Amino acid sequence: MWFLILFLALSLGGIDAAPPLQSRVVGGFNCKKNSQPWQVAVYYQKEHICGGVLLDRNWVLTAAHCYVDQYEVWLGKNKLFQEEPSAQHRLVSKSFPHPGFNMSLLMLQTIPPGADFSNDLMLLRLSKPADITDVVKPIALPTKEPKPGSKCLASGWGSITPTRWQKPDDLQCVFITLLPNENCAKVYLQKVTDVMLCAGEMGGGKDTCRDDSGGPLICDGILQGTTSYGPVPCGKPGVPAIYTNLIKFNSWIKDTMMKNA
C-alpha cells in the first residue's frame, strides 16, 4: 500500500544514529475524550490506514499519499479497536487527490533526492452526510498564515513506537512547535516548499508517525495543516516532520467541494 511506502522510503540528509527505542516515540498522551470531534479514521478493507479531518457534513480532507481504490471512514471515534455507539460509519463515494500531487512517486521502492511531495492533499466525498453531534463536528479552514513558534496539536491513531508499528486504542494527541521551513530543508533530501509546514521538537521524542497521515495539525486553536511525512524512526532528534500548509489550498478545497457537491 503506497501510504506505507512513502513513510518508510523517505531519505534524510545529515542525520546520525537513531535514538533508542521509546515506549511512545511520539511523546503523546490520550486525547481528552471527544476533544477532537473533527478527527476522522480512514480505512481500507477494514484496516485503519490514515487520519483525516471533517470539513463539513459531506467532505473529509486527508493526504494524497493515502490514495487507494476504495475507502470507508469512521467519525466521532475515540477508541480505535472498540465499538462506540456515538461513532458514525460512512462509505466514500469518490476521492479527489490534488492534481498537483505527483502520484508516480508512490510507485517507487525508494524516493530519490530532490523528489517533491508538494500538494499532498485529497478530498473524500462521503456517500451519506455526517450527522453533526457533540462528538462529530467539522472544523473550519484557516484564514491566515501560521507563525513559526506557534504551539500546535497533532492527533491520530498512528504508531506509538518508532519501528514496531504499534497502534494505540485511544486517540493520541501530541504538542509540537511550528518551526521555520529551513529547519526541515536542512535535513531532508526531498524538496521542502512553501506549501509545506515544518513542525516538531528538535530534541526529538514528539512526533506524528506511520498511519497518522492526513490527520489535523491545529496551531493556536486553528486548523493549519495535515500530516504528510516524517523521519524513520519517528521522533528522531533534529528531524521535524512535514505537514501540508492548508492556507495555500483554500481555493482548491472550496472549489472542489462546490463543483462536486
Curated annotation (Swiss-Prot):
The keyword Protease applies. It catalyses: Hydrolyzes mouse Ren2 protein (a species of prorenin present in the submandibular gland) on the carboxy side of the arginine residue at the Lys-Arg-|- pair in the N-terminus, to yield mature renin. One of its GO terms (molecular function) is peptidase activity. Keywords: Disulfide bond, Glycoprotein, Hydrolase, Protease, Serine protease, Signal, Zymogen. GO terms for biological process: zymogen activation. The keyword Oxidoreductase does not apply. It comes from the Eukaryota. Belongs to the peptidase S1 family. Kallikrein subfamily. This is Epidermal growth factor-binding protein type B. The gene is Egfbp2.
